From Swiss-Prot:
Pathway: Purine metabolism; GMP biosynthesis; GMP from XMP (L-Gln route): step 1/1
Enzyme class: ligase
Keyword terms, alphabetized: ATP-binding, Glutamine amidotransferase, GMP biosynthesis, Ligase, Nucleotide-binding, Purine biosynthesis
GO molecular function, one term: ATP binding
Name of this protein: GMP synthase [glutamine-hydrolyzing]
Reactions this protein catalyses: XMP + L-glutamine + ATP + H2O = GMP + L-glutamate + AMP + diphosphate + 2 H(+)
Pfam families assigned: GATase, GMP_synt_C, NAD_synthase
Length: 517
């Protein structure tokens, strides 16, 4: 497997104790230009020594340190001489391990709280106001600090909101410094990363590209790599990166299942094959997919048919190729975290190609598996990919098949394609395309009476869905300005045949999901 050699970068590792904010800690450190990874709390001191990090962060988590099944660590980690920052549960665990006292709080704190920094020499709060607002989320608290520590901040309901042992470079904050709700959270993490850990900001995307190109070449040699292109950001970035590294040794299969957005197949071919010279086998399978979907209206059945048929088409083409040794996928770090940590509550099914026959023995190449989504986009831009491809809206594996509610027909697909294009055009004109996390149109299968000109109509309703989210686990509907919504509505009704009504979905997730099916 060709993965990044990270030995040349300063690193700060985050140990996972189950907090919903774990990924944010890693992201914040990376935003400083320092490489960071989220690792299992079960990691040993010996394994950490091999990684040679500049610092360690203990994340928050839902446990009490006194729970029978609470997450623990190898106590030898405290003897490594590496700076440690404990956040929320991480601070309580450090206290518990080092001889302090943790108790249930008299008044639990969830949400905003004001803290007072009581030590004007506290390195974590250097040059920051003595009073600041933070984000608390805890039921236990530290009642007594371990030997060698001092209290450096307090709040009304938390007598020890932050503690420090400058000699050993061990620090704790009861609040979540990684979330934006904490007023000076970024500055606190910066002080830990640069002032305490003395890490260098030497993690850059240009260095990553050079490193990956070299490693891919060493791994692949003169052999061939197969990549399934979906037209999405991740697989497209992988394709351009691999092409830069190994050129025509890369073979791509792009299956057009007839469920893509308007002009999407042409855009992918023009950009990736035309501009970047990728070797792409395009399979036109629209008729094959639509015939399989004829008469099917149940959403899970549609998903299953689309998924199975895609795998079959991909397999049919892959079987024709000779001398393929590697399969490339656009796996991101979020996929690795969600499916590979001990504290993960759910297992995410990847949208990458799966279900390959057992007799197709490929080695796996996942060049993006250490990157977050925004870093993958940054990589695409650094590789010279066009903005409209790098910043393409997220798109589900089954495509428009789950944005047409009920039975899929070519006429219904055309309505969704045309209306979705208008939505994307107007959102971009309004300068909102980078502000709204995801937006699309959906055809609910509802028809209603309308009046157009002097005649009565009985046509379809188009739904608009636009949401903001950080990680996709929860989402809130986007507050698109009324004048922008009006332009979108007028254009769709006037330019898209068989549509006479537009509705805007103002439901959050939960209780709804982002997609309608």
């Amino acid at each position: 497997m060709a993965n990044a050699d990270l030995s040349n970068f300063d690193k700060i590792i985050v140990l996972d104790f189950g907090s919903q904010y774990n990924q944010l800690i890693t992201r914040r450190i990376r935003e400083f230009g320092i490489y960071s990874e989220l690792l299992s709390h079960k990691i040993t001191a010996e394994e950490i020594k091999k990684i040679n990090p500049k610092g360690i962060i203990f994340s928050g988590g839902p446990n009490s340190v006194y729970d029978k099944d609470a997450f623990r660590i190898d106590p030898e980690i405290y003897k490594l001489g590496i700076p440690i920052l404990g956040i929320c549960y991480g601070m309580q665990l450090m206290t518990y391990n080092l001889g302090g006292r943790v108790e249930p709080a008299d008044n639990r704190e969830y949400g905003h709280a004001d803290i007072d920094v009581t030590d004007d020499q506290a390195v974590m709060f250097k040059e920051l106001p003595a009073k600041q607002t933070v984000w608390m989320s805890h039921g236990d608290l530290v009642r007594e600090v371990p030997e060698g520590f001092k209290t450096v901040a307090t709040s009304a309901n938390c007598p020890i909101a932050s503690m420090a042992d400058d000699a050993r470079k061990f620090y704790g904050v009861q609040f979540h410094a990684e979330v934006r709700n904490t007023q000076y959270g970024n500055e606190i993490l910066r002080h830990f990363a640069f002032d305490v850990c003395e890490a260098k900001a030497n993690w850059s995307m240009n260095d990553f590209i050079d490193m990956q190109v070299q490693q891919i070449r060493e791994t692949v040699g003169d052999r061939k790599v197969l990549l399934g292109l979906s037209g999405g950001v991740d697989s497209s970035v992988v394709g351009v990166l691999l092409n830069k590294a190994i050129g025509d040794q890369l073979v791509c299969i792009f299956v057009d299942h007839g469920l893509l957005r308007k002009g999407e197949a042409k855009q992918v071919m023009d950009s990736l094959e035309g501009k970047f010279g990728l070797n792409i086998i395009k399979v036109d399978a629209q008729d094959r997919f639509l015939s399989k979907l004829a008469g099917v209206s149940e959403p899970e059945q549609k998903r299953k048919i689309i998924g199975n048929e895609f795998i079959q088409v991909f397999n049919d083409e892959a079987q024709k190729l000779k001398g393929i040794d590697f399969l490339a996928q656009g796996t991101l770090y979020t996929d690795v975290i969600e499916s590979g940590t001990d504290t993960a509550q759910t297992i995410k099914s990847h949208h990458n190609v799966g279900g390959l026959p057992e007799d197709m023995h490929f080695e796996l190449i996942e060049p993006l598996r250490t990157l977050f989504k925004d870093e993958a986009r940054d990589l695409g831009e650094k590789l010279g990919m066009p903005e409209d491809l790098v910043w393409r809206q997220p798109f589900p594996g089954p495509g428009l098949g789950i944005r047409v509610i009920g039975e899929i027909t070519e006429d219904k697909l055309q309505i969704v394609r045309d209306s979705d294009l208008i939505l994307r055009e107007e959102i971009k004109k309004a300068g909102l395309d980078r502000d709204i996390w995801q937006y699309f149109t959906v055809l609910p299968g509802i028809r209603s009476v309308g009046v157009m000109g002097d005649g009565r109509t009985y046509d379809y309703t188009v739904g608009i869905r636009a949401v903001n989210s950080i990680d996709g686990m929860t989402a809130d509907f986007a507050r698109i300005p009324w004048d922008v919504l009006q332009k979108i509505s007028v254009r769709i009704v006037n330019e898209v045949d068989h549509v006479n009504r537009i509705v805007y979905d103002i439901t959050s997730k939960p209780p709804a999901t982002v997609e309608w099916e």
